[in-house]
Amino acid sequence: MFDWLLEPLQFEFMQNALLTALIVSIICALLSCYLVLKGWSLMGDAISHAVLPGIVLAYLAGIPLAIGAFFSGIFCSLGVGYLKENSRIKEDTAMGIVFSGMFAIGLVMFTKIQTEEHLTHILFGNVLGVSHQELIQSAVISAIIFCLIVFKRKDFLLYCFDPSHARVAGLSPKILHYGLLILLALTIVSTMQVVGVILVVAMLIAPGITALTLTKSFDKMLWVAIASSIASSLIGVILSYHFDASTGACIILLQAAFFVIALAYSKIRIR
C-alpha cells in the first residue's frame, strides 16, 4: 500500500504536481468558506470563465498568462460592480451577461490561435506538467492570498455575514467587497494550472460546503475545509497517476464524494 502511494514521488514532475496541489488546496479551502457564507458560488464560476480572454491576450503578447488572467478577472468584476450600482440590473444578472460574453470572446480568440496545446491545459488543467517556475509562481501568489486572508480574517467574516453591521463597525463594505474579488481572482489564477478554468469553481466551493455541513463554528469550518481540500487534491493527483486519468477531474470527483459522505453523515447524526 505504501509503495503504491510513494511510487509517484520518485518522479520530479509528480513532486511538483503534489506540492502545487497542496499549496493551491489550502488557499482554495480558506477562500471557499467565505464564498459559501457570502453566497458567491456564481461569482467564482463567473470569474473563472472570464479570465480566458486575458489568458489568450497574454499568450499573444508573450507575457505570463497569470498576469492576463488576473487583470481580465478584475476588469470583469469591476464591470459587474458598475452595472449593479448604475443601473436597475441585479448583480447575478450582470454576472450572467458579462462573464458569459467574456468567455465567448475568449473562445473565439482561442480557436484562432495557431498553437493551442498550452492554452488547452489552462482550460482543463495540467498539474502533472507544472514546471518548477510555475510551482514557485503558485507558491508566491498563494502566500500573498494567505497573508491577506489571515490579516483581514475578521473583517471579511463580518462583511460576509452582514455588510450593514460591518459598516456600523467602521469598516468599508465596498473595500471589503472588491478586496474579496481581488483575492478570488488571484486564487483562480493560482488554481487554473491544477484543474483548469472550467473546473476551478468546484475547488472554490466544495471544501466550504463540505465543512459547513459538518460544523457549526467558523473556526472548525476552516479546518475541516482545509483537511478535505488537501486530502482530495493529494489523493486525486496520485489516483490520476496510477489510472492515467485527468488530474483535475479526479480531484473534483473526490471533493464531490467527500461532500456526499459529509451530507449523509450529518443526516445520520441528526437522527
From Swiss-Prot:
Transmembrane segments: 17-37, 55-75, 93-113, 131-151, 168-188, 194-214, 221-241, 245-265
Location(s), subcellular: Cell inner membrane
GO cellular component, one term: ATP-binding cassette (ABC) transporter complex
InterPro entries recorded: ABC_BtuC-like, ABC_TroCD
Main location: membrane
Annotated keywords: Cell inner membrane, Cell membrane, Ion transport, Iron, Iron transport, Membrane, Transmembrane, Transmembrane helix, Transport
Recorded topology in the membrane: Multi-pass membrane protein
Any single biological process term in GO: transmembrane transport
Function as written in the Swiss-Prot or TrEMBL entry: Part of an ATP-driven transport system HI_0359/HI_0360/HI_0361/HI_0362 for iron.
Assigned protein family: Belongs to the ABC-3 integral membrane protein family.
Name by which UniProt lists this protein: Probable iron transport system membrane protein HI_0359
Source organism per UniProt: Haemophilus influenzae (strain ATCC 51907 / DSM 11121 / KW20 / Rd)
